[in-house]
């Protein structure tokens, strides 16, 4: 490709509305342009990267035995009504009617469509297992699209769905998809972790997320410094302290704390160690309970894990925190003065709280706290559960090492769905025993457009993008200095361009009448891994300057050796 016949569209300045580095660099490198909130046009450089990602995904899915299909983005509402998700899905589901007043949706996912297809196409267990995938546009009407293509409304996704007659068969395909995803992200040159995850609204019995590690990530990824243990922070177990609870050394005293409405204020004003404080959060109880709320207690420096809390049988789902008005109606005190002593509703305490002694907590009286509280002396030990987020340094749940926490960007997610959708849509086949058998399902997603942004978040410097070789828009840039004035530079540039292309290498020849500084800046901005610079001075010695984008190292290579050298660097 020649720049004179290409839309490069680079920008010198960073657009003001671009928050994260991937959004900034995708705009500056001429990869995308915003059409409307959460909607982007992909320009030629962006499409080239997108196709590289797609091709790797497609190759590994095919290698894993998955079969490619293509399903419509527009889906009839009756399928969503049949599955129950018409009511369950929020405003992210874009609903509309056609000219015949028939309701439809723009698909955010395709479980209903694929299950409808399978219930009409398959009849016998002998046809299974099967795993279907597509690379297709999705639409989710995000309330606040942000971070460019990282959280856009329209995006490209690889979604796969497998069908089975047994859990054992599902597990085999699940393991194959886990391995395929690991190959996909490894081939792309990404630093990632596969982590245990909560199944969330999708449901099912098992789930793993594939997280690209990056400072800008929205998720906390937890992993052991010693073993292979890794989990999303929502799922990571906080192990109970091994040390027995220390004996009481203080009497419980009621203390006036009129200006301490938060743990931070309590600690500062009374010079308390934060590890000796407990915070109490009230959430709504499950419908039909004899009590309106449940009190959840975690140590002052810990955070409540809302996913774990929501799984408590006495807690309503979705998890809903009580308002101040609701709290006062039950406890007769505000949210800054709550604690376990004389709490009139059920209490659940975190494992760490159960091991505490001589601690401070609200007295359930406005402006007052109890200091020196001890379990079983001042208040009975209530139900104990793991309800907090882990913190760095906690013991790993597998008993090996300590936990580290890094930020991650979710680029893939695999689920064992079970029979949730097949039961709702009555998808079954004749089993081996001749009886009707509901199908067991798995689903497996990769955010293709998100992968592009995540790769940039992990691979950039002050000059621009530093693409991993496998997904770079071009492999080699040829920069001929003053080619329009120097015949030998022009002749060599054309010769190398032809020879490299004949070797199957993707080349961008910068044949613009531009200053060298502009040419260098553009090639570094768009992140082409290998650059060769042709100039009369070096050619006097039969040399060509080669530069590797990732480390910035330069070297002189003889003109007769440069093609072989580049082929070796790129193809190994």
Swiss-Prot record:
Catalyzes the attachment of proline to tRNA(Pro) in a two-step reaction: proline is first activated by ATP to form Pro-AMP and then transferred to the acceptor end of tRNA(Pro). As ProRS can inadvertently accommodate and process non-cognate amino acids such as alanine and cysteine, to avoid such errors it has two additional distinct editing activities against alanine. One activity is designated as 'pretransfer' editing and involves the tRNA(Pro)-independent hydrolysis of activated Ala-AMP. It comes from the Bacteria. The gene is proS. Consists of three domains: the N-terminal catalytic domain, the editing domain and the C-terminal anticodon-binding domain. Gene3D superfamilies: Anticodon-binding domain, Bira Bifunctional Protein, Domain 2, YbaK/aminoacyl-tRNA synthetase-associated domain. Homodimer. Belongs to the class-II aminoacyl-tRNA synthetase family. ProS type 1 subfamily. It is found in: Cytoplasm. This is Proline--tRNA ligase. Its main location: cytoplasm. Changing residue 279 to A: Severely affects the posttransfer editing activity, with little change in both the aminoacylation and the pretransfer editing activities. GO terms for cellular component: cytosol. It comes from Escherichia coli (strain K12). It holds the Pfam family HGTP_anticodon. InterPro entries: aa-tRNA-synt_IIb (IPR002314), aa-tRNA-synth_II (IPR006195), aa-tRNA-synth_II/BPL/LPL (IPR045864), Anticodon-bd (IPR004154), Anticodon-bd_dom_sf (IPR036621), Pro-tRNA-ligase_IIa (IPR002316), Pro-tRNA-synth_IIa_bac-type (IPR004500), Pro-tRNA-Synthase_IIa_type1 (IPR023717). Disulfide bonds: none annotated. Changing residue 350 to A: Abolishes the pretransfer editing activity and reduces the aminoacylation activity 20-fold and the posttransfer editing activity 5-fold.
């Amino acid at each position: 490709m020649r720049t004179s016949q290409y839309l490069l569209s680079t920008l010198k300045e960073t657009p003001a509305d671009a928050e994260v580095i991937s959004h900034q660099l995708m705009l500056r490198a001429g990869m995308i342009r915003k059409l409307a909130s959460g909607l982007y046009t992909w320009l030629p450089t962006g499409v080239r990267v997108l196709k590289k990602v797609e091709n790797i995904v497609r190759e590994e899915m095919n290698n894993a035995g998955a079969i490619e299909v293509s399903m419509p983005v527009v889906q009839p509402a009756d399928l969503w009504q049949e599955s129950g998700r018409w009511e369950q899905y929020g405003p992210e589901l874009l609903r509309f009617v056609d000219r015949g007043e028939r309701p439809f949706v723009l698909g955010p996912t395709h479980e209903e469509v694929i299950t409808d297809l399978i219930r009409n196409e398959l009849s016998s267990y002998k046809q299974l297992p099967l795993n279907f995938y597509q690379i297709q546009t999705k639409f989710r009407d995000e309330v606040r699209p942000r971070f460019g293509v990282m959280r856009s409304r329209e995006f490209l996704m690889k979604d796969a769905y497998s069908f089975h007659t047994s859990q054992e068969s599902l597990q085999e395909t699940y393991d194959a998809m886990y391995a395929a995803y690991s190959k996909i992200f490894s081939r792309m040159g990404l630093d990632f972790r596969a982590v245990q995850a909560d199944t969330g609204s999708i449901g099912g019995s098992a789930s793993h997320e594939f997280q690209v590690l990056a400072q800008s990530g929205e998720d906390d990824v937890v992993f052991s410094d010693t073993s292979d243990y890794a989990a999303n922070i929502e799922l990571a177990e906080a192990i109970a302290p091994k040390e027995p609870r220390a004996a009481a050394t203080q009497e419980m005293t009621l203390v006036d704390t009129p200006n301490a409405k938060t743990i931070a204020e309590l600690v500062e004003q009374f010079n308390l160690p934060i590890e000796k404080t407990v915070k109490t959060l009230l959430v709504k109880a499950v419908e039909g309970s004899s009590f309106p709320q449940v009190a959840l207690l975690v140590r002052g420096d810990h955070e409540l894990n809302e996913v774990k809390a929501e799984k408590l049988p006495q807690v309503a789902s979705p998890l809903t925190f009580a308002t101040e008005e609701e709290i006062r109606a039950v406890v007769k005190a505000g949210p800054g003065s709550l604690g376990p002593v004389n709490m009139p509703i059920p209490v659940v305490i975190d494992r760490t709280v159960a091991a505490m002694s001589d601690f401070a907590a609200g007295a359930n009286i406005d402006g007052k706290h109890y200091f020196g509280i001890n379990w079983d002396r001042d208040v009975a030990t209530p139900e104990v559960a793991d309800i907090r987020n882990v913190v760095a340094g906690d013991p790993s749940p597998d008993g090996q090492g300590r936990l580290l926490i890094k930020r991650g960007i979710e680029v893939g997610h695999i689920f064992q769905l079970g029979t949730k959708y097949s039961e709702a849509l009555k998808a079954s086949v004749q089993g081996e025993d001749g009886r009707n058998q509901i199908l067991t399902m798995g689903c497996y997603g990769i955010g293709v457009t998100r992968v592009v942004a995540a790769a940039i978040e992990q691979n950039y410097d002050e000059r621009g993008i530093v693409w991993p070789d496998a997904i770079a828009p071009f492999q080699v840039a040829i920069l001929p200095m003053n080619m329009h004035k120097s015949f030998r530079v022009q002749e060599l540039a054309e010769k190398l361009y032809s020879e490299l292309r004949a070797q199957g290498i993707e080349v961008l020849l910068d044949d613009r009448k531009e200053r060298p500084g502009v040419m260098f800046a553009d090639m570094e901005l768009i992140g082409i891994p290998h650059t060769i610079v042709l100039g009369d001075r070096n050619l006097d010695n039969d040399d060509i300057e080669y530069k590797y984008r990732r480390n910035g190292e330069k070297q002189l290579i003889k003109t007769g050796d440069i093609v072989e050298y580049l082929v070796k660097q790129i193809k190994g």
